[in-house]
Amino acid sequence: MEFRKNDLVTLEIEDCGIDGEGIGKADGFTVFVKDAVIGDTVTAKIIKAKKNYGYGRLMEVLKPSPYRVEPKCEFARQCGGCQLQALSYEQQLVFKTNKVKGHLERIGGFTDIPMEPIIGMDELFHYRNKAQFPVGRNKEGKIVTGFYAGRTHNIIENRDCALGVAENKEVLDRVIAHMEKYGIEPYNEATGKGLVRHVLIRYGYFTKEVMVCLILNGNKIPKEELLVKSLCEIPGMTSITINVNKKHSNVILGEEIRLLWGQEYITDRIGDISYQISPLSFYQVNPMQTQKLYAKALEYADLHGQETVWDLYCGIGTISLFLAQKAKFVRGVEIVPAAIENAKENAKLNGLENTEFFVGKAEEVLPREYKKNGVYADVIVVDPPRKGCDETLLETMVEMNPDRIVYVSCDSATLARDLKYLCERGYELRKVCPVDQFGMTVHVETVVGLQRKDT
């Protein structure tokens, strides 16, 4: 049977796609349905039809799955932030485990994978210490802020995200009220006009410090002293800055930071290590789970106090300083100059003198230091962005021949690709542990321990 756009089909959802969508079949025709849960029987409308598969919109749940739960957030289906709120948390962990395992098998070609049980979350909501809220106008002309609907730049108005902290709403209420009172225009992506693009909020989970950064299509916000006074009424307010981004693009942050009040950073803690975090810093958004993630990375590194460690894609030194507590010496590499300045300050803040940090691309710095300066490593730790490691970097890692490699990944597909490269060149998979950093979403972190085969 041939299916066309707008056809209605009844499906039993038998599987789950990597983006959390339910998968069912009608007369052999596979349909991917957002918001459907494995075990559901649903009616879906075909919104896109290919030869052997299509995409459907959930119209009605005829028989709910035993794994289906009521989403906590009323915007769960509209917003692009949470893909799994309708799925029980136990099944979310099963989904994420299978996602990692499936990528390692299909892309990496691994069998008999030494998987440890996924490390789940205790607090499923209000765990995010950072949020970026776009600002715009709705169809009625009202200034709104919230999150983008899935696969669009249409703002779903929501100042109180279920994954964020309560301080987010307090900040946004004051910023929007200030804009309305003084006629300040939100940015319009289509025209490139307007002033306020985004509001970035960071929160120190352990210190309770609050940071507000206004991303502007300009240098100054009108009546800024009155806005600062209003924001300072929020308990914990520590840093108020402006980020200037005049580019006509959808890139959120520019490079220029201007301090309005307080200091340019907040401080937070993971384990025994304190970190200074600036508006541009990369810092894990779930500090409770990050502590577990880094503890697992430290376990896999198996440090005894005599090792030289390279930490690639080190950010503000989050993993580096964890490692420095146990290693003889740690060298970190990060492409963002401001992050390296933060890393150096964080090392001083924690009294760790056995560290050195380099600015540059990991795939350029490591080969240079190895080939020109003869550096070596007992252990290499990598925590790359979603695209994974550059092959030049992997090649140098293999040439350096460290005893152990620890790979921390936010994308199990590129992880599998890179592990295949390393394991074809003298390393073996010793341990794999998924860590749920992002409950209610499809994202999962993975820590992998690799050992050189001749040891």
Residues of each region from the PLM?
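Residue-level signal for inorganic ion chemistry
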Residues: 24, 39, 82, 199, ...
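Extended interfacial segments that mediate partner engagement and assembly in macromolecular machines
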Residues: 59-71, 77-186, 206, 221
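Short, aliphatic-rich beta-strand segments
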Residues: 201, 208-217, 274-278, 379
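Short, solvent-exposed loop/turn elements at beta->coil junctions and helix N-caps
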Residues: 116-124, 189-190, 197-198, 202, ...
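Short beta-strand micro-motifs enriched in acidic
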Residues: 45-49, 134-138, 202-206, 453
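Rossmann-like S-adenosyl-L-methionine
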Residues: 2-10, 18, 223-234, 238-455
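Short, acidic/hydrophobic/Gly-rich beta-strand patch recurrent on exposed beta strands
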Residues: 22-27, 146-149, 213-215, 343
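Terminal RNA-binding accessory module
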Residues: 1-75, 356-357, 362-364
